[in-house]
């Protein structure tokens, strides 16, 4: 009887979805990240999670001329699942919902947005790769950042 109860409990636990990610679970993204290639540079700076939010800033340019900037924010959506809010050039934010994450990666999606529809971050040690793409992975563009 005890074995049957243990087996039933194990089956129930295996069938349960893991708890949803929290903003605090994305703290591995925090820091100052830089990418330099052929005179073009991009920086992303992420504050550590605090008060259930992460704030970020991205800027890029050539040599000493800034060409683009973007305000970034990760906070819980209405359902509690983290949402990545991107405000390119300071415009109104576009939301991307967290759809997958683990200890070193996070994928955010918004299938209704023109481009990008997917934003993915993957960290390995002091490197982090950010990739934007269409929802099917096409038209992908990636930046490999180093922690500074």
Question: Which ranges hold each PLM region?
Answer:
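N-terminal helix-cap/turn-to-beta initiation motif at the start of protein domains
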Residues: 18-32
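Edge beta-strand at a domain terminus
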Residues: 98, 103, 123-129, 133-148
